[in-house]
Design a protein with these regions (language model features):
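Short, flexible helix-loop junctions that flank or precede catalytic/ligand sites
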Residues: 1-358
């Protein structure tokens, strides 16, 4: 970062050793009328790279990811919003693939974590070393695995897909909400349907929730709205779930974060559907077939049942516009019932507080 420049937004990084732990600090500055606004993200990869098995995947989803990583070629995409743990998931997958016999090359902006055994390239656009230039050169380096930090534009998407069908396993991230949305986004980026249908191996969509403190969490009976939601989505009768309480270890009832996952392994039916340009709702039905993919909502509800998080946290990260199909009327109503009930309770609470002040 240029310390003499305060008129332009800037990004930078700081390495900090804290009690023997190497922390990466990501700094972002934004010029405002009152001066520079600074945000610092604190990244502790010593904790986050404890292994793929520690990232909160259910047994079923974990096996799907491992199956995808055994493919000799194809493209595996990790999707989600900024700060949803995509990089941690990608690096954890690279850990599994990283052997002396495997030529792994990454192209990143920035290189988020240095790993032994990887050939990591830092993008420097100011001298012409951008994603596309680097990717073309990487293809001449005889790689087994290519990791692209992020698919940001049409050309990068096309190069990544073409690389994956020429004998390379490609890992990357993209800012989309779920599996279906990812397929649509890649098609919007002018990736040819026949190439995408052949190349796409798996899509891992994820979001982060606060994790319940195991010391102070407290069980309580489910409400009628919650029972309805569990029944409609999981077809389960759930008599009780956990609430956040707060103690001297966590202060607010939560300690750490846990990921919600949606893992799609593409089968031949989905590949054919992409190539043949079938209707969106038909593609949705294939993607979210009960025997194929568990949605983010389903994964979230499972983690509520096992006491990992709360229904309030899952409700925060589920998007009604993208996480439900047009035909999921009963599930939408059950989900909305929880939201409406929460609004009603908040209204009554606010009314009570106003009356108390009179």
């Amino acid at each position: 970062m240029n310390i003499t420049e305060s008129r332009l937004p800037q990004d930078g990084a700081i390495k900090h050793l804290d009690d023997g732990k190497q922390l990466d600090l990501r700094v972002s500055s934004l010029p405002t009328i009152h001066g520079e606004k600074i945000v610092i993200r604190i990244l502790d990869y010593s904790m986050s790279l404890a292994g793929l098995e520690t990232l909160g995947f259910t047994d079923e989803n974990y096996e799907k990811v491992k199956t995808a990583l055994t493919a000799p070629n194809g493209i595996i995409l990790v999707t989600g919003a900024t700060g949803s743990g995509k990089s941690t998931t990608v690096y954890s997958m690279l850990q599994l693939l990283n052997t002396p016999q495997t030529n792994i090359i990454t192209v990143e902006d920035p290189v988020e974590m240095k790993m032994k055994g990887l050939n990591q390239v830092q993008v420097m656009s100011e001298i012409g070393l951008d994603f596309n230039t680097t990717l073309r050169s990487i293809l001449r380096q005889d790689p087994n695995v290519i990791m692209i930090g992020e698919i940001r534009d049409d050309e990068t998407a096309r190069i990544a897909v073409r690389a994956s069908i020429t004998g390379h396993l490609v890992l990357s991230t993209i800012h989309t909400n779920n599996s279906l949305n990812t397929i649509e986004r890649l098609l919007d980026m002018d990736v040819e349907r026949y190439l995408l249908g052949s190349a796409l191996t798996a899509i891992i969509s994820q979001r982060l929730c606060k994790k319940l403190c195991p010391k102070c969490r407290k069980s309580r009976p489910t409400t009628e709205y919650e029972k309805n939601l569990f029944k409609k989505v999981l077809n389960k009768d759930v008599p009780a779930i956990y609430d956040a309480i707060g103690c001297d270890e966590c202060f607010n009832g939560y300690k750490g974060r846990i990921a919600l996952h949606e893992v799609l392994l593409l089968n031949q039916d989905i590949r054919d559907a992409i190539i043949n340009n079938i209707k969106k709702e038909e593609l949705r039905n294939l993607v979210y077939d009960k025997d194929n993919t568990k949605t983010l909502l389903e994964d979230g509800l499972v983690k509520i049942i096992n006491g990992s998080t709360t229904i309030e946290e899952v409700v925060k990260v589920i998007d009604l516009d993208t996480d439900f199909g047009e035909n999921d009327v009963e599930i939408r109503n059950a989900f909305l019932g929880k939201e409406l009930k929460k609004d009603e309770e908040n209204f009554k609470k606010e009314q009570s507080e106003i009356i108390d002040t009179l």
